[in-house]
Design a protein with these regions (language model features):
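N-terminal cap/leader regions of alpha/beta-hydrolase-fold enzymes
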Residues: 1-236
Length: 236
């Protein structure tokens, strides 16, 4: 089940989208958007996570700008880059932490909350995990990570990172810097050969089918081990 909701903030209500699992309850996942907003693709991944048994909340991080990306236009990449460039990073992290708190407080959530993000959202999720209590972190090619490595020591939750070896936005040299900074016993780090940035996005300009399949299998396995739905049911 999917519904539109909002996160109440001191200066307004941030729109958000909620997906419930078939059971109606489970552990929570805060799903943070790529630069294209809560796009069709992000919604499809939210549904995938809900079908695994998670309660998923995806906030509209562009809400303060009063604009969204029009996915029907040819300049979708330029739109996304422009909107992301206008966001205040610290405010966006604060909004995301508020969404995490709201998700944790929902009656459907049992068994903790995790942060999960793609691209822009991968960096936001990493920052959220550094300043708030999360049970797990999943970051797909977090685009801001090269600028956030001073926070690495503050991210203590079990973490999963995915990057492509052919990412033109985050060159392999930077990816290796990220790997060195975040490595530890609670961290899984995967490089996907030949995959570029946003390889999980089904748009032809980004998609890498083999990397998508491999990364999703690794992600679902990681979640099953480190953030299991069954444990949430037992804790309820």
């Amino acid at each position: 089940m999917t519904e539109t909701t909002s996160v109440h903030l001191p200066d307004g209500d941030m729109p958000a989208h909620l997906w419930l699992p078939p059971s109606g309850s489970g552990p929570g996942i805060l799903l943070l958007q790529e630069i294209f907003g809560v796009s069709r693709y992000v919604r499809s991944r939210a549904q995938d996570l809900a079908e695994l048994g998670y309660v998923v909340l995806a906030p509209e991080l562009y809400w303060r700008l009063g604009e969204t990306v029009d996915e029907s236009r040819a300049d979708v990449l330029e739109q996304g880059m422009a909107l992301a460039g206008r966001l205040d990073w610290e405010q966006t992290v604060a909004d995301s932490v508020a969404a995490l708190t709201a998700l944790r407080a929902r009656p459907e959530v049992a068994g903790g909350v995790g942060a999960f993000g793609f691209c822009f959202g991968g960096g936001v999720a990493f920052n959220v995990a550094a300043v708030a209590d999360v049970d797990v972190l999943v970051s797909y090619y977090g685009s801001a990570l090269p600028t956030l490595l001073d926070l690495a020591g503050r991210v203590t939750a079990p973490s999963l990172h995915h990057f492509g070896t052919a990412d033109s936005y985050i060159p392999l040299e930077q990816v290796e810097r990220i790997r060195a900074a975040v490595s530890g016993p609670e961290v899984e780090f995967h490089l996907h050969e030949g995959a570029g940035h946003a390889f999980d996005n089904p748009a032809p300009m980004f998609h890498h089918s083999a990397a998508t399949a491999d990364a999703w299998a690794l992600t679902t396995g990681f979640l099953a081990r480190r953030f299991p739905v069954a444990a949430a049911g037992a804790a309820r």
